[in-house]
């Protein structure tokens, strides 16, 4: 009996696609978006090279039928698309928890040990005596949008604690409004707000406002956060007899824009201590407006503003302005390791001379200090040095105190010289782990139906532009629309097909893509085994692609001239065990790089004077002409 006319073709298709994912050894269903892309790759890059597992793992998991139906019905079918296509979409609200809390609100219903991704109104309001405890609110979630309104308002002699709010989240939008407002007596603590978050957008409004006789401690706000913005408005405003401590705000953070407004404003008989703001931050943009303004008979202490930070832009406006009978002390402002632009406006100003204020140290470069009371203010030290002098002084201080490597500075091994890429060399390996939330590519048929504009993405994915995710979308689009640097050719790829097209356009169709095989060895010492230069170690051109934060995978790809690419076996530092296979790229022309680039901080030298090498991190990739 003769075979149906299309059967041989179908069998051939099955054989081709099942062998197509050669890099990971997995068989691919031919009726999937993944298989469709592999067929596309084979047409565009017909060199029969294996498809690397790291790239195949990023492909859409959608079935072909799903890909077709979703492409025709966005945004109506968004929820099932998010689930089936492995996208980064806003987390669904915990409606069951929200309902149970609504029943138990208004002074009871606690303590609560866990709460995830819902809006909360009135916790412990009007409570008398006893204690409230809240252990964890939305920990370790992706694309969180939470609001918490009124905690312990109008309570009396109540002890309340809040242990953790939005810790370790990805793309977190957190809004906390009113904590212990108008409360009398009692005490409380807030231990951690948005700690270890990635791309946060956090707001805290009114902490102990109009409270009476309270003792309060806020331990940590946005500690070790990465790339985002935070605001805190109103701490102890109009309070009476408050003893308040704020321990850390934005310390050890990376590229964070933060604002703190009104600390202890118009307080009576308050004892306030703020221990550290923006310490060891990297490229911070900090604004602090109003500390102890209009206070009466208060004792205010501020210890440390942007100490040991790296560049950035900071301003502090108004300290103890218009205060009466205050004793205020400010210790250490602007003592940065690498100076940024720092301004301080208004210290102890006002018509009432009945105060005593001490300022122990104001240091750094590009600083300005404007407006302070002509009497009752004692300055211990004021330094306005050049950038070079300040950097030298801070470097010597760091060495003498044993701090060879500050948290903000480039991680050991993040940048290195080409001469270090030799077999047998022992060197530090940076943390190359992918910090982005997991996502997959959208099939091109779906991606091209979503205009690459913030408003369109917001509408399709239900992401308000004033949230952390919305701001990330806006930032990604803006970076993609930015004009390229001199010698750079760039493109933002919204699908896997787009990446292949750009690489072929730049390098031809006989190409390969590489990335470091795993994260083994990250953050420790390694030894290099066999080191091989790609294309014989010749100076070449590559296409490097870096992830951008978006609901689906979007890559910023750019063609980089004058590079050498290396592959290296990565061995355990103390044995002959191979633990990884690394890919490194050396940029030979750095003349257009910024003088403040972390590479020059780590290696010395200036733009154009030294080459800079780095590993290809997990999640990123580099394309070159095939050997």
UniProtKB/Swiss-Prot annotation:
Source domain of life: Eukaryota
Keywords: Glycoprotein, Signal
Tissue specificity: Expressed in stems, leaves, shoot and panicles.
One protein family per Pfam: BURP
Domain BURP: from-to ranges: 415-626
Signal peptide extent: 1-25
Matches recorded under InterPro entries: BURP_dom (IPR004873), PG-associated_BURP (IPR051897)
Residues carrying sugar: 119, 175, 251, 366, 384, 530
PANTHER family on file: POLYGALACTURONASE 1 BETA-LIKE PROTEIN 2
Protein name per UniProt: BURP domain-containing protein 12
Annotated source species: Oryza sativa subsp. japonica
Lineage: Eukaryota, Viridiplantae, Streptophyta, Embryophyta, Tracheophyta
């Amino acid at each position: 009996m003769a075979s149906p006319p299309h059967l041989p073709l179908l069998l051939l298709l099955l054989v081709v696609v099942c062998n197509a994912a050669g890099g990971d050894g997995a068989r691919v269903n031919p009726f999937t978006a993944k298989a469709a892309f592999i067929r596309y790759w084979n047409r565009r890059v017909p060199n029969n090279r294996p498809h690397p597992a790291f790239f195949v793992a990023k492909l859409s998991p959608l079935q072909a039928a799903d890909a077709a139906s979703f492409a025709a019905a966005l945004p109506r079918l968004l929820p099932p698309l998010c689930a089936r296509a492995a996208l980064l979409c806003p987390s669904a609200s915990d409606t069951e928890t929200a309902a149970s809390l609504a029943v138990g609100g208004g002074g009871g219903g606690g303590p609560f040990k866990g709460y995830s991704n819902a809006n909360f109104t009135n916790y412990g309001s009007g409570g008398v005596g006893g204690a409230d405890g809240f252990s964890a609110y939305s920990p370790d979630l992706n694309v969180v949008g939470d609001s918490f309104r009124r905690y312990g308002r109008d309570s009396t002699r109540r002890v309340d604690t809040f242990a953790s709010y939005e810790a370790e989240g990805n793309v977190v939008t957190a809004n906390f409004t009113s904590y212990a407002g108008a409360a009398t007596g009692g005490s409380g603590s807030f231990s951690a707000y948005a700690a270890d978050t990635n791309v946060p957008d956090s707001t805290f409004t009114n902490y102990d406002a109009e409270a009476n006789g309270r003792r309060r401690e806020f331990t940590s706000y946005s500690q070790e956060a990465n790339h985002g913005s935070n605001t805190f408005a109103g701490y102890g405003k109009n309070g009476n007899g408050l003893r308040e401590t704020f321990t850390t705000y934005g310390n050890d953070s990376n590229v964070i824009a933060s604002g703190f407004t009104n600390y202890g404003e118009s307080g009576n008989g308050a004892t306030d201590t703020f221990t550290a703001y923006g310490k060891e931050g990297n490229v911070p943009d900090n604004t602090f407006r109003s500390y102890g303004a209009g206070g009466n008979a208060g004792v205010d202490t501020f210890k440390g503003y942007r100490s040991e930070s790296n560049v950035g832009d900071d301003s502090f406006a108004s300290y103890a302005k218009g205060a009466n009978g205050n004793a205020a002390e400010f210790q250490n402002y602007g003592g940065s390791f690498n100076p940024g632009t720092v301004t301080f406006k208004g210290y102890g100003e006002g018509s009432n001379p009945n105060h005593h204020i001490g300022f122990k140290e104001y240091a750094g470069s590009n600083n300005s200090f404007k407006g302070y009371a002509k009497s009752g203010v004692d300055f211990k030290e004021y330094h306005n040095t050049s950038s070079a002098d300040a950097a030298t002084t801070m470097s010597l201080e760091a060495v003498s105190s044993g701090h060879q490597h500050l948290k903000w500075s480039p991680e050991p091994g993040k940048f290195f010289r080409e001469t270090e890429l030799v077999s047998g060399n022992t060197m530090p390996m940076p943390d190359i782990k992918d910090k982005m939330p997991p996502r997959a590519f959208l099939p091109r048929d779906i991606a091209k139906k979503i205009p690459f504009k913030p408003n369109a993405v917001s509408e399709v994915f239900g992401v308000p532009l004033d949230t952390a995710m919305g701001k990330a979308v806006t930032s990604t689009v803006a970076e993609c629309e930015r004009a390229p640097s001199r010698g750079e050719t760039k493109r933002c790829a919204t699908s896997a097909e787009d990446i292949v097209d750009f690489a072929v356009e730049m390098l031809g169709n006989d190409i390969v893509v590489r990335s470091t095989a795993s994260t083994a060895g990250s953050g420790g010492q390694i030894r290099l085994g066999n080191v091989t230069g790609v294309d014989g170690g010749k100076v070449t051109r590559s296409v490097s692609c870096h992830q951008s934060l978006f609901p689906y995978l979007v890559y910023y790809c750019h063609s980089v001239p004058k590079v050498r690419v290396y592959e290296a076996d990565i061995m355990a530092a103390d044995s002959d065990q191979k633990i990884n296979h690394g890919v490194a790229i050396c940029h030979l022309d750095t003349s257009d790089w910024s003088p403040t680039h972390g590479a020059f901080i780590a290696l010395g030298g200036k733009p154009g004077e030294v080459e800079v090498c780095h590993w290809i991190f997990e999640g990123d990739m580099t394309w070159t002409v095939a050997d």
